[in-house]
A protein has these predicted regions:
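Nucleotide-sugar-dependent
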Residues: 187, 240-244, 252-279, 288-299, ...
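N-terminal subdomain of nucleotide-sugar transferases
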Residues: 1-44, 81, 105, 365
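A short, well-ordered alpha-helix in the C-terminal region of glycosyltransferases
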Residues: 322, 329-344
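Nucleotide-activated donor-binding/catalytic signature segment of Leloir-type glycosyltransferases, i.e.
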Residues: 217-246, 251, 261
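Conserved donor-binding/catalytic core segment of Leloir-type glycosyltransferases
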Residues: 4-6, 171-196, 207, 251
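Conserved acidic donor-binding segment of nucleotide-sugar-dependent glycosyltransferases
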Residues: 274-275, 299-313, 322-327
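Short His-centered aromatic/hydrophobic patch
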Residues: 88-93, 111
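Carbohydrate-associated surface elements
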Residues: 133, 148-149
Length: 365
């Protein structure tokens, strides 16, 4: 089987969630079949074709025209490959659908949010999403639920905890609350500032792995409240360096704010499969994140991780204090969380699921 993966707005390799998704999917599919990736213009790697540019238009029609303009080169690059099936990340805005028509190849489209072309949805033989209500009702019958995961070889449980803490400047008796990811408003990082302000113990420290547009605001607030010394910021890191830094944490948190995330706000609940939570658990870290329907379909509160009501800083603080006060129970919870991720929620498991879908699509074509 020859699989063409179309994700022309995503840089590979990169240091954000989209890059992680595409890189890990590409690696997983490549273990099963000959796979070619059409990626953003600044991408690199074997079997990776740098092609698309960041889509700067806000209107869908202009984004679709941008993607259509890539078709001649995309067709030339894919012609010698002769794909049997095509996977389109929805934010490629129809380029995968055009290639599907050109090569008469079955199309699978991934729907993440409202960034899609109806051409991709209508042309697709199959649609996949981490929540089926993300797929418009008119084409939802073609939908199949999928889950993302973690690279459990990279986010391993046996990385050097002591060395990472020493490198970050933490002492042996510090209790370190970790976060990894982007610093956007919907990631809810202001909640960690509030936690620091209410939990005044100087031995409670915060490890912030990543960067983003809200970082200056966060640092300014920390300065105003006299909390700067309790936070360590690593800045943006290559994906492969994140596990070696994050291992220094004693508990990891994903304090999302669904009210700042448009698709989640519209549906009244957080809609994404949060990669960072899978990664935290893969490293066997006690994890705390928000209560959301899709998370409850994967994890059990208190068995695999701790959940709190979105926006409730008091409840978040209570969950973190529980980890601090119940170290043995928290460690057992983290071990169960890791076992669940290893069994069901790895990137290779996701790629294998898609490969089975491709086999069904080819058999039906």
């Amino acid at each position: 089987m020859r699989i063409l993966l179309v994700a022309t707005d995503v840089q590979v390799p990169g240091n954000h969630g989209g890059s992680t998704h595409v890189s890990e999917l590409f690696a997983g599919l490549s273990k099963r079949a000959d796979t070619l990736l059409l990626a953003r213009h600044d991408s690199e790697g074997a079997r990776v074709v740098p092609l698309g540019k960041p889509l700067r238009h806000h209107k869908k029609i202009l984004r679709q025209l941008d993607s259509a303009a890539l078709f001649p080169r995309a067709w030339r690059e894919a012609r010698s490959f002769r794909p049997d099936v095509i996977y389109e990340r929805c934010s490629s805005y129809g380029l995968g659908a055009l290639l599907s028509v050109a090569f008469d190849a079955p199309l699978l489209t991934m729907v993440l949010d409202e960034r899609f072309s109806w051409l991709s949805l209508l042309r697709a033989d199959k649609l996949v999403a981490t929540r089926l209500d993300m797929i418009p009702r008119a084409v939802r019958a073609k939908g199949e639920l999928v889950h993302w995961g973690a690279n459990v070889e990279r986010f391993a449980a046996d990385l050097d905890y002591d060395a990472a803490r020493a490198a970050a400047g933490f002492s042996a008796d510090d209790f370190v609350i970790g976060y990894s990811g982007s610093f956007k408003r919907w990631h809810g990082l202001s909640a960690l500032v509030e936690v620091a302000g209410r939990w005044r113990d100087p031995k409670v420290r915060f490890l912030m792995v990543g960067d983003g547009p809200c970082r200056p605001e966060i640092e300014a607030t920390l300065g105003e409240r006299g909390l700067v010394e309790r936070f360590v910021f690593t800045g943006s890191l290559p994906y492969e360096e994140v596990p070696g830094r994050l291992v220094a944490a004693d508990v990891c948190v994903a304090p999302f704010d669904p009210t700042e995330h448009a698709p989640s706000r519209e549906r009244g609940s957080f809609v994404l499969d949060p990669l960072k939570v899978f990664e935290y658990l893969a490293q066997q870290k006690p994890a705390v994140t928000i209560h959301a329907d899709n998370l409850l379909n994967i994890f059990r509160d208190g068995e695999h991780l701790r959940l709190y009501a979105p926006g409730d800083v008091d409840e978040l603080l209570s969950c973190l204090r529980w980890v601090y006060d119940h170290g043995d129970e928290a460690a057992q919870m983290a071990r169960r969380g890791r076992e669940l991720v290893l069994a069901k929620y790895t990137w290779q498991a996701h790629a294998d699921h898609l490969y089975r879908l491709f086999e069904r699509m080819l058999a039906a074509s």
